[in-house]
Amino acid sequence: MNDLKEEKGTREELRRSQAAPRRSGGGLKRALMVILALVVVLAVVVAAAWKDLSSLDSVRRLFSYNKVTQDEQGKVELCSFSNDRSNTFALLGDHLIVASTTGVSIYSSSGSVVDSMSVKLTNPAIAVGGQTAAVYDIGGQTLFIYSASGLVRDMSGECSGNILSVSVNSSDYLALNAEKSGYKSAVTVYDASGEKTFAFNSSEHYVIDAVVMRDCKRMAAVTLGESDGTFADTVSIYSLGSDKADSVNTLTGSLLLSLDSVAGTLSCLTDESLTLFSSDGTLSGSYRYEYPYLRGSSMDGDNYAALLLSRYRSGSTMKLVTVSSDGTEMASLDSSQEVLSMSAAGKYIAVLYSDSLVLYTPQLQEYARLDGTEYARSVIMREDGTAVLIGSSSAWLYIP
């Protein structure tokens, strides 16, 4: 009897010893399958990135917006706002800033109101930097700094006279160009924390625009003057801390529209050409418009500028052009459709036609299309390949 019990015990131990490896092997097999699946997914992502970075953005959007409910066209209503013809829009990250003659509001990516303020702005304008944006009144003395969380500081007290222009670079250095008693105009530079780092007073010429360059060590200012009996804009670059220009360049016979940056170069957009300078003032390149009328521009692409040109003062004979940081034309696209708005960001260019939205690559190959957009008035491109459509009182996010 005891021998029988011992035999049963021995068999039971043998079964347990044989079963344990099988359980371990099953767990190992499942683990290997999980690892294999992850490797496959990683391989797909790497292959997409190797083939086309926009495909990688598609994968990112798949995960970022997988819980967002889209309509059959792939768009989502973001928020609603007052129907005001004075509305000015800008994106700070994924937050929408709306400034009008009656106030400022910031909406999150989910459409909730992050901050709202009632304030009188005669000519509202927005300048966007890296993490902050300046909302100001052209010709007035109101200046607010916002982050995605809301109002950061009220800098209205810094304005000794009426504001002429404001710019914010990618490191959130701000250049305030304003009138000043005893001078034609004055430019003051503030760092990201709002501390004053440089002041420049112009006693002979009016400063049209000023920007802090990407290295945050230099400032570029454009003054309006005269050369050989014709109007001429002078582009001067100063080291912060010195009121003596390191370099001076003259743009003769053209009207400066804005200063900006393309791939770290200083971009001077005029009514006739796009001229680019390096940080030391050396000419990097220039692109003269093939069509005489500039209808739109965007300098927010990755290492390129997007320009919308027109053959005639009015009409729909258009040419969309991308220009590299050395002034070379990258691609061009002719169009006979009416263009309402154009915006570039990262590797994408959004063009809003009268009845459709088309997203292009920098080579002006069509990337995505949304038809039936008669409700939209303007568009703002985002770096992840999504675009914000702006209507009279609502905004939508288009997710390709």
Name the predicted role of every residue range.
Residues L96, A133-A134, Y173-A175, C216-A220, ...:
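Hydrophobic beta-strand positions that form the internal "hydrophobic ladder"
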Residues R30, V76-A90, V119-Q131, G161-S170, ...:
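Repeated scaffold domains used in trafficking and secretory/extracellular systems
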Residues S54, G103-S105, Q141-I145, G182-T188, ...:
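Structural motif
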Residues N66-F81, S110-S118, G150-G157, E195-N201, ...:
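A short beta-strand motif characteristic of beta-propeller blades
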Residues G281-G372:
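Intrinsically disordered, low-complexity segments enriched in Gly and acidic/Ser/Thr residues
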Residues M1-E77, N83-D84, P400:
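Sequence/structural signature of beta-propeller modules
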Residues V114-V222:
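Non-cytosolic head/periplasmic domains of membrane-anchored proteins
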Residues Y183-T275:
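Solenoidal tandem-repeat scaffolds enriched in leucines and small polar residues
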